[in-house]
């Protein structure tokens, strides 16, 4: 089972995905401007990119679980660079 971090602040959330996993799933080209990157860890926004990633995992038979973390203010993820393939 794949364990994925899911960080949420009061107004948004992001799911962590390894760049190699995104490449394996054919998802390096994300559609939103609200996903971020921290070296090879990509933080996919929860409204569009995250669900596409989770659907792709299910499609290829990879089970996953999300580990939720909530912040009171803006999440530190907002300070990362925007994702670029």
Predicted regions and their residues:
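Short, extreme N-terminal segment that most often corresponds to the first beta-strand
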Residues: 1-18
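A short, structured beta-strand/loop element
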Residues: 13-38, 54
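Short, compact, well-ordered microdomains
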Residues: 47-85
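Intrinsically disordered, low-complexity boundary segments flanking structured domains
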Residues: 1-4, 28-31, 66-67
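A short, exposed loop/beta-hairpin motif centered on an aromatic-Gly-Thr core
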Residues: 37-46
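Short, flexible beta-strand-to-coil junctions
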Residues: 10, 19-20, 46-49
